[in-house]
């Protein structure tokens, strides 16, 4: 027996030495990051590009069985987005089996005990890490190469152990397009006085920093690629989003976050986040890394960031490293160190920052070091708690399903009869994309004395993603939390309203009385739906009702393809259905059937097909020549406007403020659009607060404003028949005394009959925290074609308008007004009654020109589809006769 034991020990020792030898040989065959890039990632002044990073990871994939690189989607600019799976050789070879285990534990509440125990015994904790989504925050992606190399070559027992029990799913860069933009900018100005300058424009095709606000609406390609990981494909148990923050505060933030927290989230999620955060604090401080903070600044109340996964039962959190100027180090005096926001009241030793950083040089290499230690800590914690985390994931699945059976609401029902059928389709498809179980009703049912019809959409709450469904389908009520009893309220970090039905203008019914709709009465929706069918005749015209947002897409696309488009100038009726003024009539014939069919293929809702359209009275629609004003100061709202315009096939030309003086507006454009941007940035290329100007961090060629002559050029355009559309802070351009200089001798001074009261009302306590506010719209106005009488509009730090009796060649009409009561629909506001009877939108006339002002974002982050038509109709305003 002793001989047998000795033999086993001998064989085991030989096998271990063989494995270690093989690993060492493999490690020797793999280039280090320094050998591959020609510098150590994190070195001062050095950055690699996205393609270089992916090339290195592809080499690791080829050289090591511990890493597998998988393409998961495309960026908006068509770069491939990847996950690098990093784990033990055995785990990498068994990824398909482990993926099945993840799915079952995440989604199946009815696993029998024996199978559940088998899954928990065999499963691994999958940790999703998404890096540098904000491209100016270069550190996490620059650290990725070192982390990957270390994990695929290590022979350290501790790291081998945590790789055996966990799988690191590293998205090496969340925003490939932005990463290359930043690297290109940095290299362009490196070794010049502008080496530390900010990159002009947004570091993304469209949305820049707001890519971390898109995980409810999923508008962007890269957002959808990342969301699919935890919505539909891999169901990781843990997620970390790695960011950077300001220069002069703590060096690193780890969880838990500060209050307020989301109230629909299970307490266990917060507890696990706390465990990961506690271990991060212990491991990082133990490694000599100073300035690590927690329970500071960042809350976890609002969905929209990558951490939206916590509403899908993932233990999700973020980390934040103090920034440098891309790859250029900064020196921080001890007297410059400070804190702000929540959780730390001074830069001192605190339970939330037990070992402050003293100041001095701070380098990209420091950020890289912090990222390496934090990543290893997260993987170590995941592996050490493997069984408990896997068990908790399935327990939470069961718990959420049980809540759906026992606690209201029990269902959300979206009826097929909607004012905007295209938004009905979009909402249903979005929920399916989120991994929500959504069903068509197959037969009529009666619930609470109301008949619901076949084709209505049923969303049961008894499903694993119950928390998410409830969060995005209900209206929001902000949870009031105070710093001290009865003291100051903790203000929201971002927005406070995100209800998908309310933001899209879709009617949704919440069922709070316990009923059971048998699954035999339901048909699961597994693929995108549409409301399309083929006509049984060859149509000569398509009629698109203006109540559907998609009808504007049809009109703009049809015109671009050479089809004739008219807008109805008279209300009509077809088969008992009212067709409102402003609807679009598109005529077709045998010569353009190809274009017509291509048009229909891009839509989700059929038009009314017509054989005879001779009774319809309309005016021909021409595509306006649109100038879209976008500053160089990371103008996200303009980027979102570009996205909405591209989505609806609306052509435009981007005009920078510095180009106004030389732009022939009268000759080349019909409409000029000003998204939400500060007047001082637009006019002078400078930040301004009250009466104080601030130096910008952009190279001087990007800081030229409109200027006096450029603005005069715009005013001449207006006076001679141009249309200006403006919302948010840019409306300040058109307040107060204005001047048109027709010639050296002919100068006209005037004031438009509109005024902004926001400064006064805010001083009296008005506060709108990114909320949905009720407005009443004027009927029978071209700007409100297709709109319901009352809608919600999104307001955050917006102007508050009123009009006055006009003079000379001016006029005004109030398009939208805040009501006297029931002002707040969803979100949080203080003293919102001060809005009552104030104007939310105003149309103005000056000379032959028109101005449309919105005291809200009509297209906020591409998510407020309920008010899109106000913008689209404004683009199509006819000239004043």
Functional labels for PLM-detected ranges:
Residues 1-11:
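Bacterial N-terminal signal peptides that target proteins for export
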Residues 9-21:
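Bacterial N-terminal signal peptides
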Residues 25-138, 145-166, 213-214, 221, ...:
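Intrinsic-disorder/low-complexity accessory segments
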Residues 115-117, 192-201, 226, 238-246, ...:
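Structured alpha-helical segments in the cores of large, soluble enzyme domains
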Residues 148, 165-188:
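Carboxylate/His-rich catalytic cores and anion/metal-binding grooves
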Residues 171-175, 186, 241-249, 730:
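Short, solvent-exposed turn/loop segments enriched in Gly/Ser/Thr/Pro and often Arg
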Residues 179-204, 208, 224, 228, ...:
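Active-site-proximal cap/loop segments of hydrolase catalytic domains
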Residues 196-217, 239-257:
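Core alpha/beta catalytic barrel or barrel-like domain that forms the active/cofactor pocket
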């Amino acid at each position: 027996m002793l001989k047998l034991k000795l033999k086993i020990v001998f064989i085991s020792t030989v096998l271990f030495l063989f494995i270690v030898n093989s690993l060492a040989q493999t490690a020797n065959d793999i280039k280090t990051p320094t050998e591959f890039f020609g510098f150590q990632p994190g070195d001062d002044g050095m950055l690699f590009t996205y393609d270089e990073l992916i090339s290195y990871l592809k080499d690791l994939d080829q050289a090591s069985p511990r890493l597998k690189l998988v393409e998961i989607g495309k960026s908006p600019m068509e770069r491939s987005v990847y996950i690098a799976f990093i784990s033990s050789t055995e785990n990498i070879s068994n990824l398909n089996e482990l993926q099945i285990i993840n799915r079952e534990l995440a989604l199946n509440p009815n696993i029998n005990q024996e199978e559940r125990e088998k899954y928990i015994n065999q499963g691994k904790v999958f940790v999703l890490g998404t890096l540098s989504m904000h491209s100016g925050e270069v550190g996490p992606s620059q650290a990725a190469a070192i982390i990957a190399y270390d994990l695929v070559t290590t022979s350290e027992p501790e790291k081998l152990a945590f790789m055996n029990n966990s799988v690191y799913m590293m998205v090496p860069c969340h925003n490939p397009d932005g990463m290359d933009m930043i690297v290109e900018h940095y290299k362009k100005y490196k070794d010049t006085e502008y080496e530390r300058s900010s990159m002009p424009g947004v570091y993304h095709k469209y949305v820049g920093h707001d890519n971390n606000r898109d995980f409810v609406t999923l508008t962007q390609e890269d957002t959808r690629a990342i969301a699919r990981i935890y919505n539909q494909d891999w169901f990781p148990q843990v997620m970390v989003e790695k960011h950077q923050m300001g220069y002069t505060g703590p060096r690193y933030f780890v969880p838990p976050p500060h209050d307020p927290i989301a109230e629909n989230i299970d307490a266990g999620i917060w507890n696990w986040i706390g465990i990961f955060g506690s271990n991060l604090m212990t491991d990082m401080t133990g490694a000599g890394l100073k300035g690590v903070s927690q329970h500071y600044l960042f809350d976890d109340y609002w969905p929209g960031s990558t951490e939206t996964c916590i509403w899908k039962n993932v233990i999700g959190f973020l980390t934040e490293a103090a920034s440098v100027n891309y790859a250029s180090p900064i020196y921080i005096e001890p007297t410059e160190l400070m804190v702000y926001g929540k959780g730390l009241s001074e830069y001192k030793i605190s339970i939330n920052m037990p070992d402050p950083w003293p100041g001095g040089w701070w380098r990209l290499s420091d950020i890289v070091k912090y990222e390496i230690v934090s990543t290893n800590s997260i993987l170590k914690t995941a592996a050490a708690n493997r069984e408990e985390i896997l068990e908790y994931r399935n327990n939470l699945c069961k718990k959420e399903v049980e809540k759906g059976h026992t606690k209201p609401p029990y269902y959300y029902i979206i009826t097929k009869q909607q004012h905007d059928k295209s938004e009905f389709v979009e909402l249903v498809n979005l929920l399916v994309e989120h991994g929500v179980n959504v069903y068509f009703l197959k037969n009529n049912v009666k619930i609470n004395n109301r008949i619901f019809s076949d084709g209505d959409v049923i969303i049961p709450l008894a499903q694993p993603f119950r928390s998410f469904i409830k969060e995005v389908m209900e209206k929001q009520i902000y949870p009031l939390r105070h710093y001290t009893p009865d003291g100051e309220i903790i203000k929201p970090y971002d927005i406070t309203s995100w209800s998908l039905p309310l933001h899209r203008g879709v009617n949704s019914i919440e069922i709070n009385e316990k009923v059971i709709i048998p699954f035999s009465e339901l048909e699961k929706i597994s693929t995108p739906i549409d409301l399309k069918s083929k006509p049984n005749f060859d149509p000569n015209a398509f009629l698109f009702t203006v109540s559907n947002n998609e009808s504007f897409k049809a009109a703009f696309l049809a015109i671009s393809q050479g089809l004739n488009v008219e807008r109805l100038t008279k209300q009509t009726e077809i088969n008992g259905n009212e067709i409102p003024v402003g609807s679009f009539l598109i005529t077709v014939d045998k010569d353009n059937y190809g274009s017509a069919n291509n048009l229909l293929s891009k839509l989700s809702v059929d038009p009314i097909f017509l054989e005879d359209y001779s009774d319809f009275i309309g005016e021909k629609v021409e595509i306006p020549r649109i100038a879209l004003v976008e500053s160089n100061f990371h103008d996200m709202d303009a980027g979102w406007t570009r996205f909405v315009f591209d989505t609806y096939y609306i052509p435009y030309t981007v005009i920078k403020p510095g180009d106004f003086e030389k732009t022939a507006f009268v000759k080349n454009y019909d409409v000029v659009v000003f998204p939400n941007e500060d007047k001082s940035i637009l006019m002078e290329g400078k930040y301004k607060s009250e009466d104080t100007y601030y130096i910008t961090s952009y190279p001087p060629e990007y800081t030229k404003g409109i200027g006096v002559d450029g603005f005069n050029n715009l005013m001449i355009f207006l006076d001679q028949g141009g249309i200006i559309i403006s919302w948010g802070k840019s409306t300040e351009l058109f307040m107060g005394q204005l001047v048109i200089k027709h010639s050296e001798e002919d100068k006209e001074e005037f004031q438009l009959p509109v005024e902004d009261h926001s400064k006064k009302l805010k001083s009296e306590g008005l506060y709108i925290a990114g909320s949905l506010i009720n407005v009443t719209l004027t009927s029978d106005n071209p700007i409100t074609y297709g709109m319901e009488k009352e809608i919600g509009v999104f307001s955050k730090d917006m102007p508050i308008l009123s009009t006055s009796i006009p003079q000379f060649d001016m006029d005004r009409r109030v398009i939208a007004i805040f009501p006297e009561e029931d002002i707040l629909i969803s979100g949080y506001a203080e003293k919102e009654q001060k809005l009552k009877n104030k104007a939310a939108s105003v149309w103005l006339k000056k000379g032959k020109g028109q101005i449309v002002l919105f005291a809200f974002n009509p297209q906020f982050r591409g998510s407020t589809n309920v008010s899109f038509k106000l913008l689209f109709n404004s683009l199509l305003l006819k000239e004043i006769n």
